[in-house]
Amino acid sequence: MVGLLTSVTIFEGYDVTIFHLCTPDIARTFHMSDLDVGAMASIVRLGEMMAFVVVMLADRVGRKPIVSYTVLFYTLFTLMTALSHGLRTFTGFQSLAQLFLSGEFGVATIMISEEFPDRWRGRGVAILNMTGLIGVIAGGLFYGPVAGSRWGWRGMYFIGIAPLLLVALLRRNLRETVRFTELKRKHRGETSFVNGLRESAAQAFRGLSGPYRGRLLLVAMLWNCVMLVGAPAVTFFSLYAIRDRLWTRSQVGSAVVLAYIIGTFGHVLAGYMLDRVGRKLTTCASYVAGAAAIMLLFQTAGHTEMLTAMVATVFAFQVARTATATYSAELFPTEIRATSYSLTVQLLGRITALLTPLTIGALSRWLGGLGNAVAAVSIGPVIGAVLVALFAPETRGKPLEELAASSRETTFGSEKAAAPSG
């Protein structure tokens, strides 16, 4: 199962990397200003938010069908992205591609969390995330020769089509998770698909006023804090480095590959720290480190200093992403796990990812450039660290069923921070 699911992070790594690297080329093709780039990135991320609907379906039809079909739709819209002839079609097709890619990743995380032993869940999510390095390296290596050829940035999207079709074929052998199979057996025939889907949607938002309200709001706020590092790094680094700091395509490609190679050890460290010292300390430390690193990245001018800050930013972001994804998948019961995950990660937790690129694009003119605009939003992860320290429960080593049963309303509508379990 792990092998069949890790392909999602490989393609996510590749997709994020080529969007990351090709931004200057795309901006040149469509004659875009910083504000245009920010608006494009925000609309593309709107697709990620709409993945909430796709992941919600996994609580009704199962985990396996969703991860099997999302890869096909992602392949289709990746192809359409490569064939787009204007900014509107490019943005629209990329937004739809992100809808299915983000949905696929969300369900894959749920499946790993449900199938791995309790004491290894953190490492399981870390393994899923760290395989994205393969896609990052591929994107970085292809960028120079492909984007510089007559194929341009479109060639970067064409490259991923054949592997995606192969993955779609192999996914036919994927099995359903044991927890979901048992859940469906218990509730077989109780409601129709349409009524069940309506119930899932109602239940998702009903959770905002129910026993899991605090957990939903907390996890959503944490993802928003994480995205204040991830969104500007992905959207603007390449443009900032090439246009404002006069880096070459080769230098940018090499920097991204190096950053993600070293950053992969962030997933390894996160998996170890999550299961050894706990969720709270790991999450807090990664948030603070990410805030400091991205501020340095966009406030330094020297090549060595920028490269070092880029590596530190990616490393911290990978630790933070793994830590937050682990919380997202642990804090809700099986019957609403996928729905709650998608509500917190893909919908409510993506508000800053949606707004930050547009905000930075607008602020860049007022604050004297991209560097100052990014620095203005870098405080976000520090706020996230404070929220974790004050309100997040310690979930290390606890069975999912125990965590679901322990939910109770307190200040902030969530459980008080629990003491770390042995």
Language-model segments: which ranges?
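A late C-terminal transmembrane helix in Major Facilitator Superfamily
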Residues: 335-367
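Conserved MFS/SLC helix-loop-helix module at the cytosolic interface between two early adjacent transmembrane helices
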Residues: 50-85, 274-277
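Helix-breaking motifs and short loop linkers at transmembrane-helix boundaries and internal kinks
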Residues: 31, 62, 83-89, 117, ...
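Extracellular/periplasmic helix-loop-helix junction of adjacent transmembrane segments
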Residues: 20-51, 250
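Cytoplasmic helix-loop-helix junction between adjacent transmembrane helices
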Residues: 92-130
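Glycine-rich segments within core transmembrane alpha-helices of 12-TM secondary carriers
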Residues: 121-148, 345-356
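Central cavity-lining transmembrane alpha-helices of secondary-active solute carriers
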Residues: 42-56, 257-269
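Extracytoplasmic gate region of multi-pass secondary transporters
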Residues: 19-20, 211-264
